[in-house]
Amino acid sequence: VSRWLLRVGLALTLWAPSASAQGGGEALQAFLMTMGPGASIYERFGHNAIWIRDTTTGLDLVYNYGTFDFDEPGFVGRFVFGRPRYWLAVGSLDTTLRTYAYFQRDVVVQELALPAGKKAELALRLAENLLPDNRTYTYDYYLDNCSTRVRDMLDVILGGALRQATEGTPGEGTLRFHTQRSVSNDAAMYLGILAAMGPRADAPLDQWGEMFLPAKVQERVRELTVSDSAGNQVPLVIREDTLLQVGVHAVEPTRPDWSGRLLLVGLLISIVSVTGVRRGRAGVPGRTVATLWLVTSGIAGLVLLFLWFGTDHVATRSNWNVALLNPLGLLLIPMLWRRRAASGLGRWDVALGTGYALSLFVGLVAVWAGAQSTGEILALAFIPGVVTFVVALVLSLRPVPALPTPR
């Protein structure tokens, strides 16, 4: 969203709909807009916005809480540390539809059966949120995002009815469940996010918490009833219209299970690595693969530790995957290549090997005990971890061939 559009949108917002709102809101219509997923990782969860139409002036304004700028100074650093800055922006309906048509994303709108006074309140609150001192917030993918901001705004307008209807009612899944099914189109991103998520991601969600997903806000709003002027319960949604239907970037209804294919990858790594015990050049390919595994898993473990202790990402804390992708593996690499010292394994080697082996065991027990839903990471990492450890141990204990006796 350009700075020019933001300035123009702000001026228009504070002028036309606010004037109609102050006139009682009779001329206003309020819509929940739900955008389908896109191709990029930050588009995979979908999006939503609130559209206010002023039937007197013909002005259509779309309020979007998901605005950010990659080029903003410090954005990448704040994103990495879990403190990205997003803001509320406003644009025209025409610009919004052209943007989503360009990115081949669906757009569905639901007109809300709000009394005139509530529509006026909604327009005024959105205009107030757009003020420079109010429009910026610290974004969290699961707890405070474009969708939860829309959810919370609607709940305030509805006098808490949305929260009352959904809080405590079991949802469809967990943060991990919804994340897996949303990003399954990108194998590398899928595996990375799956590894990075800790046990917080496995806590069951109620319908209120599940509305971090725009599609869930759409569903709950569709189901909700409110009292009309006569005190009768009527659907909150007057009508639902599809403004754009492309259907290119679908999200799976259930999460995939990659355990089988990841187990095969782990077995392949292990089979090649075990040949590293061969003497001479015959063992070099196996030791090379074992080294690559220890480097990859060790660096991954360091990243997990950073996400756990060094950032504000709630979903990455207390992550048992660190036990399976252990940084100690980086220190095992010299054992794959050096000749055994005459005195045998040193105390450091024993301590290092023991720590690494215990770590793998802890990771195995954690998965079996249900401490964290990381079966796919276990399938990938456990057997290669054990095999590379055994190969390093065998090579370290193997006697050095005796030199030929000079004649």
What feature does the model see in each segment?
Residues 224-314, 324:
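Core alpha-helical transmembrane segments of integral membrane proteins
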Residues 21-251:
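Soluble extramembrane regions of membrane proteins in the secretory/endomembrane system
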Residues 2-11:
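Sec-dependent signal peptide recognition
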Residues 295-407:
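Generic detector of multi-pass transmembrane helix bundles and their immediately adjacent loops
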Residues 16-18:
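N-terminal signal peptide c-region/cleavage motif recognized by signal peptidases
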Residues 1-2, 21:
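Initiator methionine at the very start of the polypeptide chain
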Residues 91-94, 115, 174, 255-264, ...:
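General structural signal for secondary-structure boundaries
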